[in-house]
């Protein structure tokens, strides 16, 4: 009872095809792929921006004998 037979999966596949149609499924998968690609690009851009900020850091030396 815990596992599904091949007939169960064929019925599920038929229902999905009826709901979405043949042309809609590749379109949805293409949109998912574009989303993943944009997410990865955004993460790499964010890492590059963080690295640039750490490189641009400046230090200020002060003299300890000066009194305010």
UniProtKB/Swiss-Prot annotation:
The keyword Protein transport applies. Residues 53-68 have a biased composition (Basic and acidic residues). One of its GO terms (cellular component) is TAT protein transport complex. It is found in: Cell inner membrane. It is a single-pass membrane protein. GO terms for molecular function: protein transmembrane transporter activity. The chain crosses the membrane at residues 1-21. Keywords: Cell inner membrane, Cell membrane, Membrane, Protein transport, Translocation, Transmembrane, Transmembrane helix, Transport. Gene3D superfamilies: 1.20.5.3310. GO terms for biological process: protein transport by the Tat complex. Residues 48-68 are annotated as: Disordered. The Tat system comprises two distinct complexes: a TatABC complex, containing multiple copies of TatA, TatB and TatC subunits, and a separate TatA complex, containing only TatA subunits. Substrates initially bind to the TatABC complex, which probably triggers association of the separate TatA complex to form the active translocon. Part of the twin-arginine translocation (Tat) system that transports large folded proteins containing a characteristic twin-arginine motif in their signal peptide across membranes. TatA could form the protein-conducting channel of the Tat system. HAMAP family: TatA_E. Belongs to the TatA/E family. This is Sec-independent protein translocase protein TatA. It comes from Sinorhizobium medicae (strain WSM419) (Ensifer medicae).
